[in-house]
């Protein structure tokens, strides 16, 4: 065998020696790396148990036999999770934890200043002042006429929509019905605006007439008289407006319209009175049974 080795050239022997040394070094490094990984895992487990306050059952003395290199790698690997776990809460009821490395702002809010609200100067009470209802009604006196024109146009449109809904094919029925309902809702809104506008105009006219009469009486030497305001039964303003309302209604629809309004008001008050009763009509008390029983 030795004779065979002596017959080989030196270059071949050098290559063989190099390959053998490489295999031996790789096997030793693999074994060492496995031992280092095991030691690191043991040290991490021991550190986690210490942080939770449990008894350390895994010895971490194996990590010292590999020198400072293993210790440095252990510290580098543990530095990341340790900083993140320090800011975590132990439970959901615990207060939030903040890192001490974060710089605190030097700004302090000593007095809470209310946040300024942006206002439109056109509609602000500070710049616009009090609105004059008489001046507003005179400036926009054309609005009631526009509302009447719009109401008459919508009335005609509703009549045409009803006719189209009645004569349309079955497939177009839902579309025609929706269009008719939309026009009716719009007409109701315009009617409400028109009635409110006419009522306000009537009230302003009645109050202006009463003030004019009072000024004339003062010029004749009579004492000053001020109209009582409010919702009391002795309120002159309420009585005056109610009387003017009935007079206007009588001019428009006659005495029949006034009777209908009075009857409607009476029924409304009667229903309110019935609802406010402590027990039903004919019952003698709250505890008794008011149902009729069949007599055998």
Swiss-Prot record:
Subcellular location: Nucleus, Nucleolus
Low complexity: bias regions: 18-31
UniProtKB keywords: Coiled coil, Nucleus, Ribonucleoprotein, Ribosome biogenesis, rRNA processing
Region (Disordered), start-end ranges: 15-135, 253-296
Gene Ontology CC annotations of this record: 90S preribosome; nucleolus
BP term (GO), one: maturation of SSU-rRNA from tricistronic rRNA transcript (SSU-rRNA, 5.8S rRNA, LSU-rRNA)
Subcellular location, principal: nucleus
Ribonucleoprotein keyword on record: yes
Any matching Pfam family: RRP36
Superkingdom assignment: Eukaryota
Coiled-coil region: 147-203
Keyword flag Coiled coil: yes
Composition bias type Basic residues, residue spans: 262-278
Function: Component of the 90S pre-ribosome involved in the maturation of rRNAs. Required for early cleavages of the pre-RNAs in the 40S ribosomal subunit maturation pathway.
Family: Belongs to the RRP36 family.
Record's subunit section: Associates with 90S and pre-40S pre-ribosomal particles.
Protein name: rRNA biogenesis protein RRP36
Native species: Cryptococcus neoformans var. neoformans serotype D (strain B-3501A)
Taxonomic classification: Eukaryota, Fungi, Dikarya, Basidiomycota, Agaricomycotina
Recorded name of the encoding gene: RRP36
């Amino acid at each position: 065998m030795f004779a065979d080795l002596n017959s080989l050239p030196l270059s071949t022997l050098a290559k063989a020696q190099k390959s053998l040394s490489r295999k031996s070094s790789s096997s030793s490094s693999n074994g060492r790396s496995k031992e280092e990984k095991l030691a690191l895992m043991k040290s991490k487990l021991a550190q986690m148990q210490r942080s939770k306050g449990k008894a350390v059952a895994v010895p971490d003395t194996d990590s010292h036999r590999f020198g400072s290199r293993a210790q440095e790698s252990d510290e580098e690997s543990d530095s990341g999770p340790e900083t993140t776990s320090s800011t975590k809460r132990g439970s959901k009821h615990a207060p939030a934890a903040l890192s001490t490395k974060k710089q605190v702002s030097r700004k302090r809010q000593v007095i809470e200043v209310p946040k300024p609200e942006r206002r439109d100067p056109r509609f602000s009470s500070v710049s616009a002042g009090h609105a004059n209802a008489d001046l507003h009604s005179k400036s926009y006196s054309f609005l009631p006429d526009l509302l009447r024109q719009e109401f008459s146009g919508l009335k005609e449109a509703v009549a045409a929509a009803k006719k189209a809904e009645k004569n349309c094919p079955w497939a177009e029925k839902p579309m025609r019905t929706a269009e008719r309902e939309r026009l009716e809702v719009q007409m109701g809104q315009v009617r409400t605006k028109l009635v409110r506008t006419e009522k306000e105009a009537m009230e302003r006219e009645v109050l202006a007439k009463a003030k004019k009469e009072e000024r004339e009486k003062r010029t004749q030497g009579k004492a000053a008289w001020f109209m009582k305001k409010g919702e009391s039964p002795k309120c002159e303003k309420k009585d005056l407006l109610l009387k003017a309302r009935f007079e206007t209604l009588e001019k428009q629809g006659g005495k029949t319209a006034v009777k209908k309004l009075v009857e409607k008001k009476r029924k409304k008050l009667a229903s309110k009175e019935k609802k406010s009763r402590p027990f039903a009509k004919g019952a003698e008390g709250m505890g008794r049974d008011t149902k009729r029983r069949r007599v055998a």
